[in-house]
From Swiss-Prot:
This is Chaperonin GroEL. The keyword Cell membrane does not apply. GO terms for cellular component: cytoplasm. It comes from the Bacteria. It comes from Citrobacter koseri (strain ATCC BAA-895 / CDC 4225-83 / SGSC4696).
Amino acid sequence: MAAKDVKFGNDARVKMLRGVNVLADAVKVTLGPKGRNVVLDKSFGAPTITKDGVSVAREIELEDKFENMGAQMVKEVASKANDAAGDGTTTATVLAQSIITEGLKAVAAGMNPMDLKRGIDKAVAAAVEELKTLSVPCSDSKAIAQVGTISANSDETVGKLIAEAMDKVGKEGVITVEDGTGLQDELDVVEGMQFDRGYLSPYFINKPETGAVELESPFILLADKKISNIREMLPVLEAVAKAGKPLLIIAEDVEGEALATLVVNTMRGIVKVAAVKAPGFGDRRKAMLQDIATLTGGTVISEEIGMELEKSTLEDLGQAKRVVINKDTTTIIDGVGEESAIQGRVTQIRQQIEEATSDYDREKLQERVAKLAGGVAVIKVGAATEVEMKEKKARVEDALHATRAAVEEGVVAGGGVALIRVASKIAELKGQNEDQNVGIKVALRAMESPLRQIVLNCGEEPSVVANTVKSGDGNYGYNAATEEYGNMIDMGILDPTKVTRSALQYAASVAGLMITTECMVTDLPKGDAPDLGAAGGMGGMGGMGGMM
């Protein structure tokens, strides 16, 4: 086992603080509307230019092992805030740096670290409760657009696009961000349920100009098996032909004789049919078939539950207002399933999301909710260069997370004002002893740091602005973009409550751990081993010389 380097007490804390400061100083220059950019070098390709706190934090590794530990712990704050609310990473880093710096000063002055931590925790818990009372619900498009604009670094187009997307697909709908092809940002909305499976035979196409199959008010047959024998399907086909409606077959596969017969029937105009493979694989396919059944009011015909295809009737088939199938996708619009059944299914999938362990599973389940709940919107980001595209895409994703957080828990005044108001409301909070009171003061002082940093990045004097904002009340604050004072909510400067809350909680959590650190252990760097090979060679040469 390699030898370890161990540092105790103040030596350890000084090193750790140095690492914290390197990372936080790199991240905090990006805060606010006048935050600066950070350029990140990549081992290949063009450098990335970003104003996203967590992207900067992830790039930082320090050479000194002890300093690096400090930096990594603050990186954890940024990552956690990003995972919880998708934004607020820079605010969380600034808060953590302030709590750690002030907390370690108090420890150096002889305070008890555990009581300091208790004081900090007490202040943060009280602050979170106060934030909830300040929070205003965010439901109208205007407020959603404002949140998106602020989070995308004051880019109004992005804010409006996100508000429009949420308007189209609902608050629960899936909104994805992709690379666009032009210079302008675009919004593409797919209504209804769409899945990635196209028609099984081009002979089903009935709209040659678009190369698509369009079925009006079709019956939908859902089968969790391969269909290769046409006899199994005859009763259903006859019933559908009598009803005079088209039929969409969604099955594990339709092949051989069955597919050929369906194609011939369609071409002769006897019955209008189209067949597609069921989406997904394995258990996910079963679940998605069940989703489609719920949406269309049908039943999945599965041998697992003792149902046979030849015994199925029109009652087992789902229905929709319209179905559009092209080479790669199938879209079911306006299924006739009961609203209560669809809501029940959505609640069930939500429960699975809560229990999901992997991000991949969570994402897939989220997609299923969206397909059932409303639709999918795609924001296509336009940019002139690849570097700009990367930067802009990251901003749009941040803005999207922020607006979701705003819809979930409401909004508070932005620009660091909410934390200042919260701090003044809990200023009288007292702990059980003097050391806890110092911990509370450390947390209260930290709550001013985001506002001070925003002002500093504007090139103004932080103390002057902080005192002016403190002397006001309610949503009165400083608009860093226009450099004027006023009502932040009226000026459209909003922060999602969830983002501010997560930033404060994660910053205090990690800072509390660092203040109570008394010892740090790391591997000793391996010393340079003497290069024996080279020395041996030289000796040989000398010997040769002597012989000659």
